[in-house]
Amino acid sequence: MAIASRRLKTAYSIWWVTFMNGKISRRSLMQTASVAAFAASPGDAATMPAPRFEGKDTPKIALAIGDGGSAQSDPVDPLRRIRQLGVEWVLSGGPPIPWDEARLKEQMDRVKAAGLNLGNLMITGFNNAIYGRPGRDEEIEKVIASVQAAGKVGLPVVEYNWYAHRATEGYFDEIDDVRTGVGWTSFDYELARGPGHQYMGAVREGEASIKFRDLPPLPNEGAHSLKEMWETITYFLKKVIPEAEKAGVRLALHPNDPPAPISRGSQQIMGSVDGWKHLIEIVKSPSNGITFDCGVTREMGENPVEVCTYFASRDRINHVHFRNVKVTKPYERYSEVMIDEGENNMFLVMKELVKHKYPREIYPEHPRALDYDRERGRIGGYPGGGGYASFAFQVGYARAMMQAALMSV
């Protein structure tokens, strides 16, 4: 038994040091782990520490309400499907503003009855505030009322976007031939939407041959500079964040995704890490935070671990999107791939979140298209996107990363 124990410790130490430094392939990891398992004995297992699981002070794996959605031929409660994966936290889009306390409580109670907790709602419906147009003060008051209602029912996080134009035009589907048909969601700033691919959104008349980078502003949006966008969000934050603090609610601004520098003539304030850093300095409060998306971070050519450290150490990560990408050209050409095969070391990202005691939701979003979901009509509403089967893989992978991180920090 002592010899077996020494073998296990040696194999485990080699594996752990190598893995922690991000220098091990999946095949090598499995081979080394197999050696360690072979070396173990029942006596050794009795002395090994028990795994740690999600708790009050740890990150929480979450899915969106609807991620467990089923086809009409199989009408299983989607919340039940989510709970079956071991997920205890969910997020969702919010109702029209202003939010009503009674309606929010009803939604939270419905989720609670399914054994789940609602941790994040997306708030929308304030374009005049984003563009600095007449009516923005009325919209901001509706946002404040919504945040106050969220605080009264115990909703911890309200997420939002600040796009002049939310690009869909540059996305298309690609197929992973090595992984025999897995769907990727790819983005190309130089894309003109010709035949041969699935695209996101309808092609507007006369635009099929125009590259995304050259598309003109839409009449209802116009073109907006960085200066304009910073002015409007500063005005918004200085009114909303003090009220969010009083309500005990954290706001999480999602980065611009895609982070292309110009989106239909408008610049993007959340299209760079410098922009993210500037945002949290406008109002210095934990209620003024970001959605840390390690996929977008890599799309911009940045190191997600370093960026995570910067914001987590300042307690400004209020929500997390956990996904992987392969980048051809930062900002302009990349593919969203399976969570276990991109350029991000997902374990090191998770470890950094655990190290800084991040306690809120982690959403392993953007599942890849698998045949199982395709055959059942359960695929995402975007090119290359998948459904429940792929979410099950993402959740299992993210939870494994979390348990390993909790054991290592």
Regions found by a protein language model. Name each.
Residues 76-93, 153:
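Catalytic domains of carbohydrate-active enzymes, especially glycoside hydrolases
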Residues 50-74:
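Boundary/entry segment of secreted carbohydrate-active catalytic domains
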Residues 93-234, 246, 296, 354, ...:
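Structural motif corresponding to the early beta-alpha repeats
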Residues 21-58, 78, 129-132, 151-156, ...:
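Histidine-acidic metal/acid-base catalytic patches
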Residues 1-24:
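N-terminal secretory signal peptides
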Residues 69-82, 139-147, 303-309:
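Short, acidic/polar
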Residues 67-69, 96, 124-127, 162-166, ...:
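Active-site-proximal loop/turn and secondary-structure-junction residues that shape catalytic pockets
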Residues 62-66, 93, 119-122, 159-161, ...:
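A cross-family glycoside hydrolase active-site/sugar-binding cleft signature
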